[in-house]
Amino acid sequence: MMSRPAGDFMEGILAAARQDPVLLDSTPVPALDTPDESGVIDCPIAPKELPDGTMLHGYRVQRTIGSGGFGVTYLAQESLLNRRVVVKESFPDSLCYREEGTLDVCLHDPETGKEGFEWALSNFLREVRLLATLDHPCIAKVYSYFEEHRTAYYVVEFINGISLDKLAAQHARLNQPIPQSSLFGLIVRLLDALDYLHSHKLLHRDIKPDNILITRAGLPVIIDFGAAREAHGDLGTSIVETPGFSPTEQSAPNGNMGPWTDIYAFGATLYYILTGTCLPTCRQRDIYDTAEPLATNPALTALYNPALLATIDRAIMPAPAQRYQSVAEWMQDLAAIRL
């Protein structure tokens, strides 16, 4: 069992963090670029993304906000409750296309593509089931799941905010470093979310700046659980790696992953927003580590308590055993810091 810090201790830190929420403007979440279609189809096809205005199970598509190799993400309006939501569609585009007129998802080759398409749907459903068990203010909530157009969809809470990487870029552009109290509040809130996730025996495995949204109220919210896995399950069968944010064990087929894996990625995220640069990849760091410790960086120690920076340095140690093994360990070190 992974332990959690005592309730009074956690509540005390969270209460202090709430005194100074992370600063941000009201910039809306931008649409992501959509890659071009590839492959030759000898029958009429529609664009990969559903047209704006399409009705899906009581949700009206407003626009596409993301598109990748395994799915499409839409901003939509729920008719019944009159609220904005995010709808994720399973769409492995190397295996399927959208039929013109019906908008149904059809296989390029029904014989060779069926197994891969069913595998993608199975992973999609697994993601829904993982998310549906979670209830934390810093984790996006799942509302519903349905099947339509020969594929599957699930509906997630819409987070009206700005990604952490864009927020950090705004501060850098204005030459306004994130205040220490705001940084501390961000760290504590997200560590609490990770601790909650780990207490449910789940690993996110893809913590990075653009998977954290900051709301207008200053609340950080973790999104995109497509790489999440059960901590006690077989983690080695699926390699998900983001250079500069993923630790060594995540790039190995049988890497020993645990809470320390998400801890590294979160530390790497903090390193990025403080320095404006990504860490070298873990392969590079294993050969020759050029990452300068934050706690000895004069430009940063002039702005932040070196003890706070030292906790981030420990989180991003290349060797898993040298990192914090749990969120509780990191929080204990934070509790001893006087800002």
Which residues fall in each region the model found?
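Activation segment signature within eukaryotic-like protein kinase domains
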Residues: 186-187
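AlphaC helix of the protein kinase catalytic domain
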Residues: 164-177
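Catalytic-loop of the protein kinase fold
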Residues: 198-214
